[in-house]
Amino acid sequence: MKSKTRILFTLTILLFSISLAAQQEKNIPIGFNLQLKNMHLWRGLQVSNEVTLASDLYFTDKNQAFKLGIWGGAGISGKYKEFDYYASYQHKGFQISVWDIYNFSKDATYNNSEVFNYKAHETGHFVDVSVGYTFQGKFPLSLSWSTVIFGRDRGANNKENLYSTYVYASYPILKDKFIDLEVGIAGAFALNPEDGTSANFYASSAGIVNINLTASKKLEFGKYTLPVSVMGMWNPKGNNANIQIALDLLTF
């Protein structure tokens, strides 16, 4: 136990040192983020219920408008594993992104062993397209529309894509105060549901799948900055609730 504690302490000091150096660099075309979470929540879903490390490596232009990257997550026990590709663009309040998401967790009920299999009826991937806008000025409401356009979103009969859609709205209640506080709500439905059901990627029927409240703060340790967030998430359709705590250990 003492050995594990020493290793964890050494790793923490190393990450702090690397991040401090990285935060002093400017205008580099490569970005990286390492995040530690008590669990991984996404769009109303509890993707991982164990301590999770998430990493994001991307290339960007000098204005950081375009991004092309890979995102990965892994649970501490190895049960949860994910590897994604993405491309995104943002300008002022407008954002658009395309994600190829591949969760190959150990207990998955779909194809979790063929990363290069993109056959519509067999693949474990799904491709999600999101478009969003954040209003500028005194009313910074954010709205987004996300639709799964390909992959494991084909319903119980596996005949054709359901085009499951997730519509989200969020608003910052507090900004640049002692803490930042944001509230959000989302609904999900299928654009092409199977006969006799409104089941979609996110729930067994159409409805509200995510109500959340997120508090975030940047902690200062000398020249090192540690962003911390706590998100309470309620899923009315799933009849569950969770709290996610996240630490951005390393960012450059």
Positions of the model-derived regions?
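Residues that define the transmembrane beta-barrel architecture of outer-membrane proteins
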Residues: 26-30, 49-53, 79-83, 90, ...
